[in-house]
C-alpha cells in the first residue's frame, strides 16, 4: 500500500530528524512527500529537513507555507514554518509564524513555549531581587498592563 510506505518513510525520516541526522532524514522525507503529495505534514517536515540540511530556504519556506494553508489549525505546521525561518536567521518572520499559529491553534502550549524562546524578556523591575520574587512578579504584571494601556513596546 502506498499510504503505509509513505508513513513508514515519514516515521523513519522523523526519527532521524529528531536524532539530528538531517542529511540521512532527507531521502526518507522526500520519498514520503512523493508518495503522498497532498499530506501537509510530509510537506512541512520536508521543508524543515531541506532548510536544515541543504539550506534551501526558499523551497523550505514554500513547502511549509503550503502545508499551513492546507491545515490552518495544526500547531506543528506553524512550529515547522517558524523553525525554517529561525534556521534561516529570520527571527521576526519566525515570531510572525508563531503569532499566526496562536490565532488558529490557541490551545497548543507548544506555540506559547516557542514564542517565549524567540522573544526577549524585559529585565526584572527590581534588578536586585530575583525574577521570581513576589514583589518583582507583581510589579512586572503592573508594568505589562501599564505598557499595554499606554501602547508602549519596551
Feature map (PLM): residue ranges:
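Structural signature of tandem alpha-helical TPR/SEL1-like repeats
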Residues: 18-28, 53-66, 88-100, 124-130
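Helix-start (N-cap) detector for alpha-helical repeat units in TPR-like alpha-solenoids
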Residues: 5-7, 40-41, 57, 75-76, ...
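Canonical tetratricopeptide repeat
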Residues: 45-46, 80, 114
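TPR/TPR-like (Sel1-like) alpha-helical repeat modules
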Residues: 86-139
Amino acid at each position: 500500500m502506498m499510504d503505509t510506505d509513505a508513513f513508514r518513510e515519514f516515521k523513519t525520516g522523523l526519527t532521524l530528524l529528531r536524532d539530528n541526522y538531517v542529511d540521512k532524514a532527507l531521502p526518507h522525507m522526500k520519498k514520503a512527500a512523493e508518495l503522498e503529495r497532498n499530506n501537509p505534514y510530509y510537506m512541512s517536515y520536508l521543508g524543515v529537513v531541506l532548510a536544515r540540511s541543504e539550506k534551501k530556504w526558499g523551497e523550505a519556506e514554500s513547502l511549509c507555507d503550503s502545508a499551513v494553508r492546507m491545515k490552518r489549525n495544526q500547531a506543528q505546521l506553524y512550529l515547522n514554518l517558524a523553525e525554517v525561518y529561525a534556521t534561516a536567521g529570520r527571527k521576526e518572520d519566525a515570531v510572525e509564524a508563531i503569532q499566526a499559529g496562536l490565532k488558529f491553534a490557541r490551545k497548543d502550549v507548544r506555540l506559547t513555549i516557542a514564542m517565549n524562546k524567540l522573544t526577549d524578556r524585559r529585565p526584572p523591575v527590581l534588578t536586585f531581587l530575583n525574577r521570581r520574587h513576589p514583589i518583582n512578579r507583581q510589579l512586572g504584571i503592573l508594568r505589562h498592563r501599564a505598557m499595554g494601556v499606554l501602547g508602549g513596546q519596551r
